[in-house]
Amino acid sequence: MMPRELPPVAHIEITAALLQNLVGADASTVLEIGAHHGDHTLGLLHTFPRATVHSFEPDPRAFAVHQRLIRDKRSKLYQLAIGGTNGRAEFHMSDGLPPGPVDALKRNYPKGWDQSGSLCAPTGHVEKHPWCKFTRTISVEVRTLDTWASKHAPGTIDFIWADMQGAEGALATHGAQALARTRFMYCEYSNEELYAGEPTLERLLELMPAFEIVHRLPDDVLLRNTAFAG
C-alpha cells in the first residue's frame, strides 16, 4: 500500500463551533481516552449537550482530581487504560514539574506531574522534556477499545478524543470493530518516537485506512471515517 500524501500542517484552533459543525451538536456518544483532570471533559460536555461522555484515566492521581471536579451526570469516568490487552499492564507514571511559576504548579500538581504517563515506556520524551521524570510504574486495569465498546457503546460512536501518550497504535489495532462505527476522531501524534512503539502519523493512517484527515495540526490530527454508513 502506497503511503498517503499528508496535507500541510494547519495552525488553527479546534473550537467547539468547529466540532459542532463537523460532528453535530446532537452527538450522543463521545469517548475521551486520556481524561487527565477533566478540562477537556468539560469542553466536550459543553460542545455536545446531548452526549454521554465516557472518559478514561488510569493514573490514580489524575483520576481522583477528575472525580472530584466533574459532577455532570452525562460524564462517565473509568479508571482504566485503553490499550492492546484485557487485564492489567504496567503503567509508567510521570513526575516532576515543568519550568514555570513553582507555587502555581505545585498547587495544580501536588503529587507531581500526572499528565504524561503511558502504557508505553518513555524513550525520546526523556530527552525532549528532561524535567519530566519516569521513576516508577504501577499496575493498571486495561481494556481494548473493542472489548470495552462491545459492552458500553455497541452502537454509533460519534467522536473520540484520544490523548494516549504513544499508545495510539494499540487503539487502532485492537479497536478496529469500534472504529468502524466511529464517525470522527481527534488524537495526538508524533513523528518522532517519544514512547516505545509510538506510530508516526503516516503509520497511524495505515492502521486506520477508512479514516481521512480533516485538519492536521502540529501535534494533533482530526480524522473523518469515510466508510461510515450510519
Please state what every model-predicted region is.
Residues M1-G230:
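Phosphate/nucleotide-binding beta-alpha loop and adjacent structural elements of enzyme active sites
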